[in-house]
């Protein structure tokens, strides 16, 4: 069995949150907002734990805790005290008192602490035995027996109940009275219930009416019947209380469930927001990871390309060495063949001239031995070359295998990177799928909650339909009355709009109705004393009507006060608006001054900034031009150096055998220098492009400066026009003040219209000022400005004419506008001071305008565009002025409509007065007609009473309907505001997500564009390098052909130089001298080249700092420059070594001149062979270059394909991520919409339930009031019967003669008492309305004193008793017994309560 917890908390939402937590912990909860509600709940159902708030509205929680701990509602009742103002010290101090609580919590606290503390004080689960023991110890009442079946109605249907005063709610006094009444019959409740089930009571017998004992018996039977009805009412009351408690418990459980669902929804939203933030963070991390991977990929590709290039370079070097070894081997083979041929010739010559060369035989043998040694050496060298060749080939193959392995590793790494990227993309897709699944689950949960809510609504609707069906079955005759009530409500709804016009009529009607009712009451008390019961009912109704009219009078008084307050608020609003206009005018003038100062400061800053930019650009341009000149000089020097090197190569053909390796190295250096020259040319082109962009920026900056100066000139012109317009405005304002001084005195209703007209006029003047400020831009447009100013002046005159027309209707506004006029005078004085300050400022600006007019010629190009813009603005201003004029006309029409409405209201008031006069006349005629006959008077009184009650009911229902509609309007307004906030929040979220997606898309597009640009630059450079290599190959081919031709020419020359050895030796000496000079020139050129290379390196470093995209290439260029510097040093060493060798050879040349003729042929043959070798090398080199170009193209194609695939995959991943984010945003939006609808439906349901509970409380209060009235009647009748019985018991001791003598007076007295028992004792008559209590006591005092007086003198006792009464003793009154109609009324009342 669940423990019960009572939560006493004034804040409903906080109480629901605590109830949700405790219900989740296994407790059953109930709520109470005040201490009184908590006490009632403790009296009805004893809880196991009370969660008490110390700060309550009606009573302190500490006091209530002390009452609970004192045992007022049972012993051992646990209390958990909450406080937000006492603090820890206050709670600790209260803990030391005898009435300390069982637990304390300081607000704010965690809900988990509340659950834990509650679990520690009272465990959530106990057995049924403990519960039964607690119930037995605490005196818990058992459930009352089931409600008895309802009595059947009469055959003709239940009669109409008498009209009674409706009460809004039950009070504590009413509840105490009900408890006392039901407790008085509790001991005989079962017997009374059994008697109440009798369908029909026998009518009283006629013979019992003649004796006092019979009358007492009749009164006893009537009293017993009433007690039986009270027993049934008490049973029905208990059943209704239990139903109400169960309904409140169910509503509380539903509220707790709704609060729990709200907390779950808030938790889900929080978790969803956290998941969304985590998803966004993961997306950002993924984007950063992808960017890092792309950068790593690009860097890896770049490194791979560099490695491939270096490896190809090494391969080229190895191939060059192999080709060099092959050439050396072929040369040695040629020399060997040549030696063999010489050997054959020598043998033949030896056979022929054996005798001649016997002397030379030893020499020849030595020569043969030397040749054989040389042959052996050459053979050994050939073998070494072959071994070296084999080793080189094996190393090349091994190197190729290593390169293949590295390429394979790089490809595997690329595949692994792609796999990782695919895995990451799949992970993101999985996350997106999980997010979508989570959104689907959330949607399903929301649908389930909606379904549960719909089921609860359907169940509640079914219950409401059942209750309405029961009410419809029991209230058959009220259906027609309800239709009439609806029709009258519609009519009253239409009359609500006219209630302001009927205030005076209702007041007069109130006074006349009160006077008429009092007069009618006096006449009825004087004329129809025999109809005392009806008179009592009429008196009660008159009091009810009086109360209703007094309430109506109070309401009308409150409405008049509200109208007066609204009038005061309108006057205050008018004054505030005038002050706001003055402040706005001051703020506008201050804003104009501030804008002028800002324009001046902006101009100075802009001029300084532009001057600095121009100086920086000029210095940058000079530096760029200097670098360009240096680059050009470097290119010219390099070209001259290339030409010098080519001449040196052509001049050194005679020493080709010793300088062949140097030629190959020099060719390589020339190609590298050509590449550097091309790179320098590209850098020069880029520098020129940068220079062009800089010049364009300089031109744009100058244009901006010119436009700024033009804008400044226009602003100054506008300032002049503003000053002029200000003076005109001051004049216009002075005229307006003179005109308004004559228009004082106005009705309170039209003062607001005048203020609106003045505000419109001020706005029109402000728009005129703005238009004039805009149109006075230049002196060329001054004529157009004046024309528009005249048009505006005409419009202003029309406005003044319209204002003069309005002045006729505004003659009573002097008192209202006096204060406004004084404030306006102050503002005029301030404007005059401001005008003087502006005049001084204009004088200062006049000198500046003269200086700026010289600069106006530069802005003529922008003048036409500005003029068109000003013309457009002038058209818009004219249109706006027309709109303001139409608005003024609309206000005038509204004023006329208001006047017409006021006249119609006066007409309606007059018509209402006439109708009231007619009604009064008709009422007087009706009263005269009622005086003629008693029956006519009774009928008219019944009609008047019914009409008054209907009016009261209709007025009450109208008030309730009006309050309900106001509450609904407030609720709809709050719902609309909440919906607008939700929509604004969703729009903001959507805008944020859209901007985020656009930003990411722009970043990706920029990255893609950057990568495409880098790729295109790389391809362009690679194409350029390929073309350069082809060009160098062609140059080399041409150089080889030229050298071949030179070699052929040299062969011809060598044949002719055999006889000119001496002259050639001298020529060689001259050539050596020239070579020395060329060597010196080469050294100087190398030194200059080094300086140029250093300057080029510095320029390249600076360009590297400016162009981040060429950083890698510039680093390579620097490395090449360093290599070139090293090669230049090596070249200088080689040149020195060659010069030393040439000097040594020059010393030996004279010795070998004699052998030169013999070696000339050999050298020619060797030259031919070398030329052929060079041709073969060049062809092989061209072939290798083509292979390399093909390989580079293949690599570029593979790289482009890989980049395309990677970009496609990245784009697909980004599109999927974007689609997932779009779906997620849509899901969030749908969820928000569902939550908004769900909240709105919950609020509607709560409002309906609240209205239903209020209606039920109203019905219950009405029934309780009726029961209280009937019980009071019964109790008074019972008291009278007891007094009568006591009197008759005292009479039983007297003799028969005095009894007969006193029979007639006793009968009269009995009749009087019987009649008095039927009176309505709740509402006193008009004569005793001010003191109802004293009126009741004298009525009972004579009857109580009668027996005491009769004891000593029985015979004269009856006259003495009768002398105390107000009625004469000789009248005979007929006792009006309860009829069947009254019985049926009570039966119908009880049956209605049963249902």
Swiss-Prot record:
Question: Which Gene Ontology BP annotations are present?
Answer: phosphorelay signal transduction system
| Gene Ontology molecular function, alphabetical | chromatin binding
Q: Quote the subcellular location field of this record.
A: Cytoplasm
Q: Which keywords, in A-to-Z order, does the entry hold?
A: Coiled coil, Cytoplasm, Motor protein, Phosphoprotein
Which InterPro entries does this one have?
A: CheY-like_superfamily, Sig_transdc_resp-reg_receiver
Entry keyword Transit peptide: no
Compositional bias of kind Acidic residues: 1382-1395
**4-aspartylphosphate-modified residues are where?**
48
Which residues lie in Low complexity bias regions? 1291-1306, 1326-1352
Coiled-coil intervals, chain numbering:
213-911
Q: Look up keyword Cytoplasm and say if it applies.
A: yes
Q: Which GO terms describe its cellular component?
A: chromatin; condensed chromosome; condensin complex; cytoplasm
Report residue spans for region: Disordered: 137-172, 874-893, 919-947, 1212-1249, 1287-1312, 1326-1395
Bias (Basic and acidic residues) occurs at 919-928, 1228-1249
Q: Which residues form the Response regulatory domain?
A: 4-122
Q: Which PANTHER family match?
A: STRUCTURAL MAINTENANCE OF CHROMOSOMES PROTEIN 2 (PTHR43941:SF1)
Query: Could you tell me what this protein does?
Result: Required for adventurous-gliding motility (A motility), in response to environmental signals sensed by the frz chemosensory system. Forms ordered clusters that span the cell length and that remain stationary relative to the surface across which the cells move, serving as anchor points (focal, transient adhesion sites) that allow the bacterium to move forward. Clusters disassemble at the lagging cell pole.
| Subunit composition and interactions | Interacts with MglA.
Name used for this protein in its record: Adventurous-gliding motility protein Z
């Amino acid at each position: 069995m669940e423990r019960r917890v009572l939560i006493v908390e004034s804040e409903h939402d906080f109480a629901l949150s605590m109830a949700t937590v405790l219900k989740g912990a296994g407790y059953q909860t109930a709520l109470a907002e005040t201490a009184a509600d908590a006490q009632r709940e403790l009296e009805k159902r004893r809880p196991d734990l009370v969660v008490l708030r110390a700060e309550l509205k009606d009573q302190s929680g500490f006091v209530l805790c002390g009452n609970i701990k004192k045992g007022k509602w049972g012993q051992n009742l646990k209390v958990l005290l909450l406080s937000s103002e006492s603090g820890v010290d206050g709670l600790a101090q209260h803990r030391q008192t005898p009435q300390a609580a069982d637990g304390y919590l300081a607000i704010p606290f965690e809900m988990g602490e509340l659950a834990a503390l509650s679990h520690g004080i009272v465990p959530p689960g106990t057995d049924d035995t403990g519960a039964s023991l607690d119930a037995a110890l605490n005196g818990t009442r058992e459930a009352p027996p089931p409600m008895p079946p309802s009595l059947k109605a009469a055959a003709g249907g239940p009669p109409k109940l008498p009209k009674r005063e409706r009460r809004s709610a039950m009070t504590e006094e009413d509840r105490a009275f009900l408890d006392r009444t039901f407790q008085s019959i509790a001991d005989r409740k079962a017997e009374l219930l059994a008697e109440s089930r009798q369908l029909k009571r026998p009518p009283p017998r006629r013979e019992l009416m003649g004796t006092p004992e019979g009358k007492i018996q009749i009164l006893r039977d009537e009293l017993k019947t009433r007690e039986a009805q009270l027993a049934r009412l008490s049973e029905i009351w208990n059943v209704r209380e239990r139903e109400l408690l169960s309904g409140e418990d169910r509503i509380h459980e539903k509220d707790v469930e709704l609060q729990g669902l709200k907390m779950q929804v808030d938790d889900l939203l929080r978790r969803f927001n956290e998941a969304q933030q985590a998803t966004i963070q993961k997306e950002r991390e993924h984007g950063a990871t992808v960017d890092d991977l792309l950068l790593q990929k690009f860097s890896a590709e770049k490194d791979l390309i560099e490695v491939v290039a270096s490896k190809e370079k090494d391969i080229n070097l190895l191939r060059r060495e192999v080709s060099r070894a092959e050439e050396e081997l072929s040369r040695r083979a040629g020399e060997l063949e040549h030696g063999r041929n010489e050997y054959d010739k020598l043998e033949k010559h030896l056979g022929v001239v054996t005798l001649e060369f016997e002397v030379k035989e030893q020499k020849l043998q030595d020569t043969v031995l030397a040749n054989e040694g040389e042959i052996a050496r050459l053979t050994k060298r050939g073998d070494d070359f072959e071994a070296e060749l084999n080793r080189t080939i094996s190393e090349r193959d091994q190197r190729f295998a290593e390169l293949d392995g590295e390429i394979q590793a790089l490809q595997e790494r690329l595949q692994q990177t792609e796999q990782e990227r695919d895995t990451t993309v799949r992970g993101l897709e999985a996350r997106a799928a999980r997010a979508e699944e989570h959104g689907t689950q959330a949607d399903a949960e929301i649908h389930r909650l909606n379904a549960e809510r719909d089921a609860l609504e359907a169940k509640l609707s079914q219950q409401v339909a059942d209750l309405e069906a029961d009410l419809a079955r029991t209230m058959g005759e009220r259906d027609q009355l309800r239709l009439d009530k609806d029709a009258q409500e519609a009519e009253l709804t239409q009359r609500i709009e006219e209630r302001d016009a009927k205030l005076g009529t209702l007041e007069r009607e109130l006074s006349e109705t009160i006077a008429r009712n009092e007069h009618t009451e006096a006449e009825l008390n004087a004329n129809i004393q025999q109809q005392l019961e009806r008179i009592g009912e009429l008196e009660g109704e008159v009091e009810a009507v009086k109360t209703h009219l007094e309430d109506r009078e109070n309401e009308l008084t409150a409405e008049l006060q509200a109208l007066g307050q609204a009038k005061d608020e309108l006057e205050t609003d008018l004054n505030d608006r005038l002050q706001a206009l003055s402040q706005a005018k001051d703020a506008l003038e201050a804003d104009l001054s501030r804008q002028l100062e800002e324009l001046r400061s902006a101009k100075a800053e802009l001029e300084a900034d532009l001057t600095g930019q121009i100086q920086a650009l000029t210095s940058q341009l000079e530096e760029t031009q200097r670098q360009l000149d240096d680059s050009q000089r470097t290119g010219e020097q390099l070209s001259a150096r290339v030409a010098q090197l080519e001449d040196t190569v052509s001049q050194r053909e005679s020493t080709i055998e010793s300088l062949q390796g140097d030629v190959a190295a020099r060719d390589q250096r020339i190609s590298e220098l050509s590449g550097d020259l091309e790179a320098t040319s590209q850098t020069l082109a880029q520098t020129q492009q940068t220079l062009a962009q800089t010049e364009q920026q300089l031109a744009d900056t100058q244009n901006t400066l010119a436009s700024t100066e033009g804008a400044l000139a226009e602003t100054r012109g506008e300032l002049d026009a503003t000053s002029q317009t200000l003076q005109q405005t001051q004049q216009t304002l002075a005229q307006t003040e003179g005109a308004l001084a004559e228009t004082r005195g106005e009705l309170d209703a039209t003062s607001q219209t005048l203020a609106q007209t003045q505000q419109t006029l001020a706005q029109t003047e402000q728009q005129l000022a703005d238009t004039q400020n805009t149109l006075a831009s230049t002196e060329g447009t001054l004529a157009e400005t004046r024309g528009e100013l005249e048009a505006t002046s005409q419009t202003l005159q029309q406005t003044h004419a319209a204002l003069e027309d309005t002045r006729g209707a505004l003659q009573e506004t002097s008192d209202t506008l006096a204060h406004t006029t004084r404030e306006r005078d102050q503002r005029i004085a301030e404007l005059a001071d401001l005008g003087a300050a502006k005049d001084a400022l204009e004088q200062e600006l006049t000198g500046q305008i003269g200086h700026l007019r010289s600069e106006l010629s530069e802005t003529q190009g922008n003048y036409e565009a500005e003029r068109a813009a000003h013309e457009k603005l002038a058209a818009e201003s004219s249109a706006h002025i027309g709109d303001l004029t139409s608005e003024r006309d609309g206000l005038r029409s509204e004023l006329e409509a208001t006047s017409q409405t006021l006249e119609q209201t006066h007409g309606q008031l007059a018509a209402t007065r006439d109708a009231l006069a007619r009604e009064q006349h008709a009422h007087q005629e009706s009263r005269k007609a009622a005086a003629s006959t008693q029956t006519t008077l009774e009928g008219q009184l019944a009609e008047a009473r019914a009409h008054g009650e209907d009016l009261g009911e209709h007025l009450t229902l109208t008030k309730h309907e009006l309050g309900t509609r106001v509450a609904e309007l407030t609720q709809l307004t709050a719902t609309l505001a909440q919906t607008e906030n939700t929509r604004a929040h969703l729009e903001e979220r959507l805008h944020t997500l859209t901007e985020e997606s656009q930003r990411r898309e722009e970043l990706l597009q920029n990255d893609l564009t950057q990568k495409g640009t880098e790729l295109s630059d790389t391809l362009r450079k690679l194409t350029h390098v390929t073309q350069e290599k082809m060009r160098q190959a062609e140059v080399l081919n041409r150089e080889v052909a030229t050298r071949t031709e030179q070699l052929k020419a040299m062969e011809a020359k060598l044949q002719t130089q055999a006889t000119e050895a001496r002259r050639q030796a001298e020529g060689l000496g001259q050539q050596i001298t020239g070579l020395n000079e060329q060597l010196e020139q080469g050294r100087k050129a190398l030194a200059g080249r080094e300086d140029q290379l250093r300057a080029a390196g510095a320029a390249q470093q600076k360009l590297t700092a400016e162009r981040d995209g060429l950083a890698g290439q510039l680093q390579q260029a620097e490395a090449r420059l360093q290599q070139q510097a090293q090669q230049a040093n090596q070249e200088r060493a080689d040149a020195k070594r060659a010069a030393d060798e040439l000097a040594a050879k020059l010393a030996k040349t004279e010795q070998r001149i004699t052998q030169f003729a013999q070696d000339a042929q050999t050298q020619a043959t060797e030259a031919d062979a070398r030329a052929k070798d060079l041709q073969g090398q060049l062809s092989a080199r061209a072939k290798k270059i083509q292979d390399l170009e093909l390989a580079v193209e293949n690599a570029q194609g593979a790289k482009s394909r890989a980049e395309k695939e990677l970009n496609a995959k990245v784009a697909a991943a980004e599109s999927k991520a974007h689609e997932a984010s779009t779906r997620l945003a849509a899901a969030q939006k749908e969820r928000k919409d569902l939550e908004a609808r769900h909240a709105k439906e919950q609020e509607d349901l709560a409002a309906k339930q609240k209205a239903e509970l209020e209606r039920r409380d109203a019905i219950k209060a009405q029934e309780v009031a009726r029961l209280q009235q009937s019980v009071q009647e019964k109790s008074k009748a019972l008291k009278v019967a007891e007094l009568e019985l006591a009197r008759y018991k005292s009479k039983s001791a007297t003799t028969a003669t005095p009894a007969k003598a006193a029979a007639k007076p006793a009968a009269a007295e009995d009749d009087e008492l019987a009649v008095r028992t039927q009176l309505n004792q709740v509402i006193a008559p008009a004569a005793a309305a001010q003191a109802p209590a004293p009126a009741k006591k004298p009525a009972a005092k004579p009857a109580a004193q009668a027996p005491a007086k009769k004891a000593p003198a029985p015979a004269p006792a009856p006259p003495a008793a009768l002398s105390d009464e107000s009625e004469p003793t000789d009248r005979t009154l007929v006792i009006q017994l309860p009829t069947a109609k009254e019985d049926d009324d009570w039966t119908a009342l009880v049956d209605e309560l049963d249902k």
